[in-house]
């Protein structure tokens, strides 16, 4: 019996030791678990502070970036303002250079009418010269006709014929005068006005030529009657 009891006691002891070891291990694990949270708490606090510092630095960097961007924009605006006045004087200079170029055109236009008027004046002069030439040509023809008729007619009749001839020659010589007066008016008038007197002068010459012809025919009729 005693042996059994001893075994039981020993078994109890063994169990007790095992239980004690288990308890110790459990307590150690508990202490370790308790210690790790305590150690992790400072680390978490340190991490939180680092995060806060990083977040604070980021806004600072962002603010610095915004300030730099604003400065760049201000510089760009100032540069644009400086370039704009420079461009405006250049444009004004270009416009001033372009404006004087058309100026010679009116001068040329003003000079053009001068030669045109000069050309018109010679035209008018030529027309008047033609009219006077026609009148002069008609006058010699009248003179020749009178010379041929004078020998055939008697002396008094020749005198009477010469008197109308003189009267006929006077209008012919007096008529070219208005044409000479018309020349300055034609030089001052435009081309259309200058062209108008030109046909008028030959028209005036035609009546002059017709008048001597009529005078010559009347003289011939008088000579035939005689």
From Swiss-Prot:
Residues 106-140, 150-226 have a biased composition (Low complexity). A lipid is attached at residue 2 (N-myristoyl glycine). GO terms for cellular component: cell junction; chromatin; COP9 signalosome; cytoplasm; growth cone; nuclear matrix; nuclear speck; nucleus. Coiled coil: none annotated. It is a lipid-anchor. GO terms for molecular function: calmodulin binding; protein domain specific binding; transcription cis-regulatory region binding; transcription corepressor activity. The modification Phosphothreonine is found at residues 31, 36. This is Brain acid soluble protein 1.
């Amino acid at each position: 019996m005693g042996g059994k009891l001893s075994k039981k006691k020993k078994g109890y002891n063994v169990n007790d030791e095992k239980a004690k070891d288990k308890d110790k291990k459990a307590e150690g694990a508990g202490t370790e678990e308790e210690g790790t949270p305590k150690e992790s708490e400072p680390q978490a606090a340190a991490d939180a502070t680092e995060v806060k510092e990083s977040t604070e630095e980021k806004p600072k960097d962002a603010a610095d970036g915004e300030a730099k961007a604003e400065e760049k924009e201000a510089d760009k605006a100032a540069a644009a303002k400086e370039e704009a006045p420079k461009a405006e004087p250049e444009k004004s200079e270009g416009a001033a250079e372009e404006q004087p170029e058309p100026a010679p055109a009116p001068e040329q236009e003003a000079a053009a009418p001068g030669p045109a008027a000069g050309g018109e004046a010679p035209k008018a002069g030529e027309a008047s010269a033609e009219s006077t030439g026609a009148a002069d040509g008609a006058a010699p023809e009248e003179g020749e006709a009178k010379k041929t008729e004078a020998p055939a007619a008697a002396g008094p009749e020749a005198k009477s014929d010469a008197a109308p001839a003189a009267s006929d020659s006077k209008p012919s010589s007096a008529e070219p005068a208005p044409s000479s007066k018309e020349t300055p008016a034609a030089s001052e008038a435009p081309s259309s006005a200058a062209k108008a007197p030109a046909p008028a002068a030959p028209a005036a010459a035609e009546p002059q030529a017709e008048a001597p012809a009529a005078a010559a025919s009347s003289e011939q009729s008088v000579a035939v009657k005689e």
